[in-house]
């Protein structure tokens, strides 16, 4: 079983072409729904009394929600952001932490023996605390963001030291080490403790650092881009979901996991919020994977 810990949010996303208000979002939502295409997935997080019943049902249909706390006294985490014309830059308009500000995470007894744990972008101290609740996972992967790097860098470093792998984007990696070279960043990530590091570069693909080697992978070519919000979390969910089905962790399985991460990220950006991810099936993923291999085979 895979357990995903992170935020479940109501997102307001503004692009030059469309605005969607208070739609289902959050790091754990995207990551868990993406991962559920590969492995039985459970989710740990908190929502407020204003969380729509329809979103609760949507999550319930895709993942195990016994680890989801519903507060009767507070509101759901709300994130309001705007994208630039080319959708490459996002500006935060408003962040309302609400119920997550004082959230003390717990997990159901059934989750304790989870073999796979994904710590989605969240407060690094909360991530480390929830990690203590699991018995002995086979694989732990984490994510982070610029906010935590700028304000809690030491805790981010400690968190990275406790996991098997880390996924973050190019700007975050450069910020973490105050280093302009992405390859140097990847090597430095590996030196902290994890067995592998993945740096996502958006439309320029991804870079894997494993066993002292670099493995770059181009992005899946996508012409329809509506909302990039959940791309990274969808990548992470698919990445660990795919690895959970493999017999061993090696360069081959990691490279294939990166392909599946890019594929699920490419699906996520084709519609607003979570809409695309909940409307694809195994055949859609398989067809895109085969096309991906065909494009990049010489």
Question: Where does each model-flagged region fall?
Answer:
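Conserved phosphate-binding/catalytic region of the ribokinase-like
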Residues: 182-298
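Active-site metal-binding loops of divalent metal-dependent hydrolases
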Residues: 6-8, 234
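Conserved N-terminal subdomain of the carbohydrate kinase-like
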Residues: 10-22, 37-119, 132-137, 286-298
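Conserved beta-alpha-beta core of the PfkB/ribokinase-like small-molecule kinase fold
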Residues: 116-187, 205
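Short, conserved phosphate/pyrophosphate- and ester-handling motifs at nucleotide-, phospho-/glycolipid
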Residues: 35, 169, 232
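Extreme N-terminal starter segment of soluble prokaryotic enzymes
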Residues: 1-3
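Histidine-anchored nucleotide/phosphate-binding helix
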Residues: 26-36, 131-132
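Short beta-strand scaffold segments in enzyme catalytic cores
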Residues: 33, 78-82, 205-209
